[in-house]
């Protein structure tokens, strides 16, 4: 939705000391989102003038010479516009005025000196396609103006247009009045408008069938329409809506001021019997575009469709400059009916967008009052609207459990209460009474959201919870997580033969023998799961399953719980990364080391407090028939990392590349251990390696915050 900052400022009665930037910031803080801000002003130093005399340039019949009185002096200005009249007021560019990047200067034209240029609306910065036809390619004339007043101030040209994204449940805020009320609540001001609750005379002859509607009212004025001022036309154009005539412009004013779609009909073309029904036929909508209706909701005069409900009018019944008698219609309809019609018409307008959203009874009532104000409330209506405030049980203590504090003792409570009262909320008798324009408030949580919008999320004081770390023997975390790494769970026997129980990587002191057993194949509890996992691999390979990634949580030795992983598909480093992902919340360190049955170059042991708790290896070809990488971890011995709450640092990370000279590959693990223990280091990565004689040189890139980089340079003697 496009809003004029000047109009919002005026309606919300905001002091000039409140800057545009503060208003924009307030819109964001109270739950809306400013998508863009555009400066509207494209001119400077223009003036009001009074045409005292008009005559033709003797050397050019298409040029009119105008003698014009300005606040500072008389000037002669020539123009090709043929609608200039004596005793009419105009707006003009005079010497040193600017139009975009063009500076206006006095100059001779066809033998007559011209001291400026008369303004059209297009030259003031308005889109030509939005200007009324009567002003197209013409100078706009005024019946009255104050020569001392600056036209830029009078027409609100020194303005900013903000494009605000409105939440779908806040359709009411698509209008100036409610957005201004929101700003008034934020800045604690009294608005320059009043939400009234008027009662009108009922039309004696109108018969309205409201079936298929949520609310529907016809309004027939009994007094002449107040002229839509040029200032109001400019406001409509600032919303990127075309101006047509006073009747249509009034409906568009109601749209932007109250977010209420409104239609106007030529009264002489419709009957007094109006109904809302679903119709299937071909019609010609405004703009003479023909469409086929397929059970679409329409407003009918007797049996003739006069508009597609909430979307657009039918061409034959619209108003124009010649319309003398007219009827306005405002209605609320089911959103599904409107959305279906939008698809049929294939026309996406501001009116159809708002009709497709839920509209409250309060918005409906405000729109009716605004519309009738242009006739001094001298109207006949098909019915009057009920305006009852909804309520539900509520006490402020209801919010305490959500905020973990006594709400009434919060430092800004009274200020927020005042803001909510400005919005129309009433808190009394253990109830909250809701503004009638709000349809989105239903629960205590909604009141909490309203409270926090004006309290300010940035003003909340958060207290970190007291987290007590504990160890758990629940293995579900592994069973749920590991499959996401592309491993399938398998099940194997814990019992093996004595001949096969030859691998003891954890150095168990004794084998666990069964006193009774069914066969020699199942007489001991295994000391490692590696042979069992290889058997599963071989089983799958025989069945042409070539890529095998498996895991199991099983028993080894004296009821030790072991996590085993095997892959014949992944590289050693990729497999190691999987293990790191599984152990991300555990205390451990990697060290160079291995066993007789592991590959000499691809083998790592896992320790915690110098105790062996696991290993990662590639199987040695002399001991195993298949090629695979394997990991085994005593998960009952894993300890959880201590959870610490730290403030988030939003500054960018810096990098530092350091060369480490180590005599052997095992020395690299010592470097890693040193880096892991340093709390100043955010992360690190090996990026290069080369051999120099008997020395290995590793280049490691370190990421850290800027304030820690210098300390790290000192630590590593850089």
UniProtKB/Swiss-Prot annotation:
GO MF terms listed in the record are: ATP binding; magnesium ion binding; phenylalanine-tRNA ligase activity; tRNA binding
Instruction: Name the UniProt key words of this record, in alphabetical order.
Output: Aminoacyl-tRNA synthetase, ATP-binding, Cytoplasm, Ligase, Magnesium, Metal-binding, Nucleotide-binding, Protein biosynthesis, RNA-binding, tRNA-binding
Under the heading PROSITE patterns, the entry gives: B5, TRBD
Q: Which InterPro entries match?
A: aa-tRNA-synth_II/BPL/LPL (IPR045864), B3/B4_tRNA-bd (IPR005146), DNA-bd_dom_put_sf (IPR009061), NA-bd_OB-fold (IPR012340), Phe-tRNA-ligase_IIc_bsu (IPR045060), Phe-tRNA-ligase_IIc_bsu_bact (IPR004532), Phe-tRNA_synthase-like_B3/B4 (IPR020825), PheRS_beta_core (IPR041616)
The question of whether RNA-binding is a record keyword is answered with: yes
Quote the record's binding site residues for Mg(2+).
440, 446, 449-450
- Recite the UniProt cofactor note for this protein: Binds 2 magnesium ions per tetramer.
Ranges for the B5 domain? 387-462
- Reported EC number(s) for this entry are 6.1.1.20
Cofactors demanded by this protein: Mg(2+)
Cite the tRNA-binding domain residue spans from the record: 40-153
Please name the PANTHER family in this protein's record. PHENYLALANINE--TRNA LIGASE BETA SUBUNIT, PHENYLALANYL-TRNA SYNTHETASE BETA CHAIN AND LEUCINE-RICH REPEAT-CONTAINING PROTEIN 47
Give the UniProt family note: Belongs to the phenylalanyl-tRNA synthetase beta subunit family. Type 1 subfamily.
Q: Quaternary arrangement and interactors, per the entry?
A: Tetramer of two alpha and two beta subunits.
Protein name in UniProt: Phenylalanine--tRNA ligase beta subunit
Recorded source organism is: Mycoplasmopsis pulmonis (strain UAB CTIP) (Mycoplasma pulmonis)
């Amino acid at each position: 939705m496009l809003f004029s900052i000047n109009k919002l400022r005026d309606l919300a009665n905001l002091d000039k000391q409140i800057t545009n930037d503060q208003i924009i910031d307030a819109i964001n803080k109270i739950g809306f989102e400013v998508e863009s801000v555009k400066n509207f002003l494209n001119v400077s130093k223009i003036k009001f003038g009074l045409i005292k005399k008009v005559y033709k340039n003797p050397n050019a019949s298409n040029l009119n010479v105008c003698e014009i009185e300005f606040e500072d002096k008389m000037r002669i200005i020539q123009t090709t516009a043929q609608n200039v009249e004596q005793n009419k007021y105009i707006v003009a560019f005079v010497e040193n005025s600017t139009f975009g990047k063009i500076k206006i200067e006095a100059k001779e034209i066809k033998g007559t000196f011209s001291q400026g240029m008369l303004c059209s609306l297009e030259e003031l910065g308005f889109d030509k396609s939005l200007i009324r036809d009567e002003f197209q390619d013409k100078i706009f004339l005024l019946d009255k103006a104050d020569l001392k007043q600056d036209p830029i101030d009078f027409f609100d040209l020194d303005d900013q247009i903000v494009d605000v994204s409105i939440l779908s449940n806040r359709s009411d805020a698509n209008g100036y009045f409610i957005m201004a009320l929101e700003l008034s609540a934020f800045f604690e001001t009294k608005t320059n408008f009043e939400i009234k609750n008027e009662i009108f005379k009922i039309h004696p002859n109108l018969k309205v069938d409201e079936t298929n509607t949520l609310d529907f009212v016809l309004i027939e004025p009994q007094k002449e329409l107040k002229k839509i001022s040029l200032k109001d036309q400019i406001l409509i154009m600032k919303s990127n809506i075309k101006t047509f005539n006073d009747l249509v412009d009034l409906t568009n004013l109601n749209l932007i001021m109250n977010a209420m779609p409104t239609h106007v009909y030529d009264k002489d073309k419709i009957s007094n019997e109006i109904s809302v029904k679903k119709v299937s036929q071909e019609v010609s909508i405004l703009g003479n575009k023909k469409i086929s209706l397929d059970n679409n909701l329409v407003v009918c005069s007797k049996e003739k469709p006069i508009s597609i409900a909430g979307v657009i009018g039918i061409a034959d019944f619209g108003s124009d400059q010649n319309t003398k008698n007219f009827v306005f219609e405002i209605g609320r309809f089911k959103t599904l009916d409107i959305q279906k019609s939008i698809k049929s018409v294939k026309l996406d307008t501001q009116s159809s967008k708002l009709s497709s959203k839920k509209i409250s009874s309060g918005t409906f009532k405000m729109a009716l009052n605004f519309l009738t104000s242009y006739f001094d409330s001298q109207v006949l209506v098909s019915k009057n609207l009920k305006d009852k405030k909804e309520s539900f049980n509520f006490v402020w203590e209801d919010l305490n459990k959500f905020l973990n504090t006594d709400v009434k003792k919060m430092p800004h409570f009274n200020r927020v209460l005042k803001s909510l009262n400005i919005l129309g909320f009433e808190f009394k008798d253990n109830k909250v009474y809701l503004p009638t324009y709000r349809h989105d408030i239903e629960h205590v949580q909604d009141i909490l959201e309203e409270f926090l919008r004006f309290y300010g999320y940035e003003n909340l004081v958060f207290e970190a919870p007291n987290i007590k770390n504990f160890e758990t023997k629940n293995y579900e975390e592994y069973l749920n997580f590991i499959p996401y790494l592309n491993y399938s769970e398998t099940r194997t026997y814990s019992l093996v033969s004595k001949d096969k129980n030859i691998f003891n990587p954890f150095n168990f002191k004794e084998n666990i023998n069964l006193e009774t057993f069914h066969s020699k194949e199942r007489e001991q509890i295994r000391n490692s799961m590696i042979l069992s996992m290889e058997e599963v691999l071989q089983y799958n390979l025989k069945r042409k399953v070539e890529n095998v990634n498996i895991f199991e949580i099983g028993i080894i030795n004296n009821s030790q719980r072991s996590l085993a992983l095997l892959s014949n598909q992944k590289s050693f480093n990729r497999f190691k990364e999987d293990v790191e992902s599984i152990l991300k919340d555990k205390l451990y360190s990697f060290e160079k080391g291995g066993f007789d049955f592991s590959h000499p170059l691809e083998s790592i042991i896992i320790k915690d407090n110098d105790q062996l708790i696991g290993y990662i290896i590639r199987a040695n070809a002399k001991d195993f028939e298949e090629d695979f990488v394997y990991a085994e971890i005593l998960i009952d011995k894993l300890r959880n990392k201590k959870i610490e709450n730290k403030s988030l640092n939003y500054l960018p990370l810096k990098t530092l590349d350091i060369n480490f000279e180590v005599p052997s590959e095992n020395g690299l693990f010592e470097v890693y251990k040193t880096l892991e223990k340093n709390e100043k280091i955010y992360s690190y990565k090996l990026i290069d390696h080369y051999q120099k004689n008997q020395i290995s040189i590793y280049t490691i890139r370190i990421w850290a915050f800027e304030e820690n980089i210098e300390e790290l340079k000192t630590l590593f003697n850089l």
